[in-house]
């Protein structure tokens, strides 16, 4: 089974080798048919502390690295477009 990949924005980089990434998702409410935005925070591994708050990044599933970290940052949006 392939690893999931998500795109989000770094909201915190205060921890060593860890960033908190907010991932937004949109869906239509089943009854009211209104588009709803929901977000979730993921703790992701950042080995070199290279990502700062406000960066748009891609994260990929990985083995559990700590109590909360199950994701790893692979690249930023700037690297992907360059």
Curated annotation (Swiss-Prot):
The keyword Protein biosynthesis does not apply. CDD domains: Ribosomal_uS17 (cd00364). Keywords: Ribonucleoprotein, Ribosomal protein, RNA-binding, rRNA-binding. SUPFAM superfamilies: Nucleic acid-binding proteins. It comes from the Bacteria. GO terms for cellular component: cytosolic small ribosomal subunit. One of its GO terms (molecular function) is rRNA binding. InterPro entries: NA-bd_OB-fold, Ribosomal_uS17, Ribosomal_uS17_bact/chlr, Ribosomal_uS17_CS. GO terms for biological process: translation. Coiled coil: none annotated. One of the primary rRNA binding proteins, it binds specifically to the 5'-end of 16S ribosomal RNA. Belongs to the universal ribosomal protein uS17 family. Part of the 30S ribosomal subunit. This is Small ribosomal subunit protein uS17. It comes from Afipia carboxidovorans (strain ATCC 49405 / DSM 1227 / KCTC 32145 / OM5) (Oligotropha carboxidovorans).
């Amino acid at each position: 089974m392939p690893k999931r990949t998500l795109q989000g924005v770094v909201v915190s980089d205060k921890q060593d080798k860890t960033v908190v990434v907010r991932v937004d998702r949109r869906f239509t409410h089943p009854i009211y048919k209104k588009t709803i935005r929901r977000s979730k925070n993921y703790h992701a591994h950042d080995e070199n502390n290279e990502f700062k708050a406000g960066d748009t990044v891609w994260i990929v599933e990985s083995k559990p690295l700590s109590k909360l970290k199950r994701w790893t940052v692979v690249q930023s949006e700037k690297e992907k477009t360059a």
